[in-house]
Amino acid sequence: MDCFKVFEVVFQSEINPLLLIPAVATIALTLCCYCYHGYQWIRDRRTARIEEQQAQLPLPLSRISITPGCSMVATTKLTHSRNSVDIY
């Protein structure tokens, strides 16, 4: 249906067009709230997924370990190195 035909029907009817403003505003506000709710839901799911992945992966650990009886200080890197990005 053509847009102009809709306007013609509205203006020819006995309905006051000013009465349609609250209904249109309510529908627009409902649509905005629905879109914002979807945006929040997607953002929360993304945050939860990132937190879940961080909880599953061990933290990159680089520490100095001193072996008893040995004067040498060894650096130990457990699990991750700079090249471990290729694994994921």
From Swiss-Prot:
<keyword id="KW-0472">Membrane</keyword>
<dbReference type="GO" id="GO:1904980">
    <property type="term" value="P:positive regulation of endosome organization"/>
</dbReference>
<dbReference type="Pfam" id="PF21944">
    <property type="entry name" value="Hemotin"/>
</dbReference>
<keyword id="KW-1133">Transmembrane helix</keyword>
<keyword id="KW-0581">Phagocytosis</keyword>
<protein>
    <recommendedName>
        <fullName>Hemotin</fullName>
    </recommendedName>
</protein>
<dbReference type="InterPro" id="IPR047851">
    <property type="entry name" value="Hemotin"/>
</dbReference>
<keyword id="KW-0967">Endosome</keyword>
<dbReference type="GO" id="GO:0006909">
    <property type="term" value="P:phagocytosis"/>
</dbReference>
<comment type="subunit">
    <text>Interacts with 14-3-3zeta.</text>
</comment>
<feature type="transmembrane region" description="Helical">
    <location>
        <begin position="15"/>
        <end position="37"/>
    </location>
</feature>
<keyword id="KW-0812">Transmembrane</keyword>
<dbReference type="GO" id="GO:0031901">
    <property type="term" value="C:early endosome membrane"/>
</dbReference>
<dbReference type="GO" id="GO:1900426">
    <property type="term" value="P:positive regulation of defense response to bacterium"/>
</dbReference>
<feature type="topological domain" description="Cytoplasmic">
    <location>
        <begin position="38"/>
        <end position="88"/>
    </location>
</feature>
<feature type="topological domain" description="Lumenal">
    <location>
        <begin position="1"/>
        <end position="14"/>
    </location>
</feature>
<dbReference type="GO" id="GO:0050766">
    <property type="term" value="P:positive regulation of phagocytosis"/>
</dbReference>
<comment type="function">
    <text>Negatively regulates early endosome maturation by binding to and repressing the activity of 14-3-3zeta which prevents the 14-3-3zeta-mediated activation of phosphoinositide 3-kinase Pi3K68D. This, in turn, inhibits the Pi3K68D-mediated conversion of phosphatidylinositol to phosphatidylinositol-3-phosphate and prevents progression of early endosomes through the maturation process which regulates subsequent steps of phagocytic processing.</text>
</comment>
